[in-house]
Curated annotation (Swiss-Prot):
Source species: Mus musculus (Mouse)
Transmembrane segments: none
Domain of life: Eukaryota
Listed Pfam families: DUF3528, Homeodomain
InterPro entries: DUF3528, HD, HD_metazoa, Homeobox_CS, Homeodomain-like_sf
Glycyl lysine isopeptide (Lys-Gly) (interchain with G-Cter in SUMO2), cross-linked positions: 82, 116, 178
The protein's name: Homeobox protein Hox-C11
Length: 304
């Protein structure tokens, strides 16, 4: 009934045909990236290393001489020229050895030096310690054990007369200077007491009718006031004519002055605010007294 149909036309091309077709196209595009291709992994083991083990020319670094070597010595065993912690006994012993070699001191004095400096390293220092050390030790060892030797002269000036050395002349001079002024006040007090006694004698002569109780009462304050300094009255500072004229002019217009005007006057007259305030208070009291005197004079009434 049906004509025979060649199914090969409807089927996909065979594997051989596809391979031939792919080979033709692959020759054209051999240098293109194909997803189905595997990646090439080179073998670097066969290639020689870039830096040989024994280079023919040594590379010199310019900063190699400036880099300090690695410190393998402990901190306590370093030479005593460096600054150390105050509780490191190893530095104390190193300092003693260096001093012994420098000053050529016998071994017996080294123990004295260690005992002398034990307080400065251990923290238990007594200025009046009986241990003695040779004079050469103080010439080479710092007096402060922290700062360099150049700072010893400052410690000599600051702590004069302290510890082992005798008192220096500047300190003794200061003590003498302090002790000398103490004598004049005694003589001055004596003269003041004599002057007070003379004044009391004059009062007795002028007032013979005064009772004994009042005399003793006046004598006790005199004795108590003798040791104290005499009360000197504050020196009066009179105002100049220009200041008085300006103050009187302001008082003529305003008997009571406000704060702003008071500050203005104090700046203009080179006075303090308190001086202007007190002057106006005194001037008001004076004006009150003058007005009362005028009223008494014109009225003829003495009771006013």
């Amino acid at each position: 009934m049906f004509n025979s149909v060649n199914l090969g036309n409807f089927c996909s091309p065979s594997r051989k045909e596809r391979g031939a077709d792919f080979g033709e196209r692959g020759s054209c595009t051999s240098n293109l990236y194909l997803p189905s291709c595997t990646y090439y992994v080179p073998e670097f083991s066969t290639v020689s290393s870039f830096l040989p083990q024994a280079p023919s020319r040594q590379i010199s670094y310019p900063y190699s001489a400036q880099v300090p070597p690695v410190r393998e010595v402990s901190y306590g065993l370093e030479p005593s020229g460096k600054w150390h912690h105050r509780n490191s006994y190893s530095s104390c012993y190193a300092a003693a050895d260096e001093l012994m070699h420098r000053e050529c001191l016998p071994p017996s004095t080294v123990t004295e030096i260690l005992m002398k400096n034990e307080g400065s390293y251990g923290g238990h220092h007594h200025p009046s310690a009986p241990h003695a050390a040779p004079a050469g030790f103080y010439s080479s060892v710092n007096k402060n054990s922290v700062l360099p030797q150049a700072f010893d002269r400052f410690f000599d000036n600051a702590y004069c007369g302290g510890g082992d050395a005798p008192a220096e002349p500047p300190c003794s001079g200061k003590g003498e200077a302090k002790g000398e002024p103490e004598a004049p006040p005694a003589s001055g007090l004596a003269s003041r007491a004599e002057a007070g006694a003379e004044a009391e004698a004059e009062e007795e002569n002028t007032n013979p009718s005064s009772s004994g109780s009042s005399h003793s009462a006046t004598k006790e304050p005199a004795k108590g006031a003798a040791p104290n300094a005499p009360r000197t009255r504050k020196k009066r500072c009179p105002y100049s004519k220009f200041q008085i004229r300006e103050l009187e002019r302001e008082f003529f217009f305003n008997v009571y002055i406000n704060k702003e005007k008071r500050l203005q006057l104090s700046r203009m007259l080179n006075l303090t605010d308190r001086q202007v305030k007190i002057w106006f208070q005194n001037r008001r009291m004076k004006e009150k007294k003058l007005s009362r005197d005028r009223l008494q004079y014109f009225s003829g009434n003495p009771l006013l």
